């Protein structure tokens, strides 16, 4: 009716939506032949434009186009230390150089993460989100390479008490720890299925991750323990992907109703997801879905209801991942039925 509605949002609230718009735009390009100068020519100076171009870089990386990005242009993107641009570039490079162990790409990742700098280096005080992207980018570059040194450094960041960062120490720490867990899992992707994991180093790593997942919240700072537990579960999910390791699955199993007070409900989602990915035996049936939780719908018992839905949500996500690309009608129908679960 001619009324002008003015926006009440802050400018920064649109940064991530613009970032995702940029990713979508780049994905439309497909296999087009692009070069370094063409990519850099699309950069923008406006706030929304910078966020959108950051996502554009990630989208190009998903297509592998950032292999053609010159080193000079890469460092021109990194020099202003704009967080979203760095995140988009680092993850895009990681996707473009997936599993190659490329030395130049690794150098870009390592510069973003204080934990990967040589001893005695001048602290760069990167933001926590930038360092989280660097960790995940490192995992992508060394995906399924079993590169032991990189894996060791990533494992050390799962429970790092302090991070040399420009932010308040707790800002985005969950993203940092989860990125370390995912990156560690990527470096050793499917290792438990590909090898016997019989070395002492492998045993030590598995025991460490399983112990972190199972640590009760009362034994240390609740937030730090929960953060490490979730990151360790993600690492186990990828490291033992479809391996059928029952010992690892047992460590990830949901607690009994009597022990629900010792674990946050959201951690149950991650553990349920990881357990299903480790076993790899998901089937699109109500029987399988019911088997993922030790009790049936708890009615009005709120703590048990929260746990029940989180465990079920993790199982549904795992089913979607394991059946991705199959166009399985039974899996689709089962997941749609969960939307009306009461």
Residue ranges, per PLM feature:
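Mature, well-folded catalytic/scaffold domains that follow N-terminal targeting or propeptide regions
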Residues: 1-342
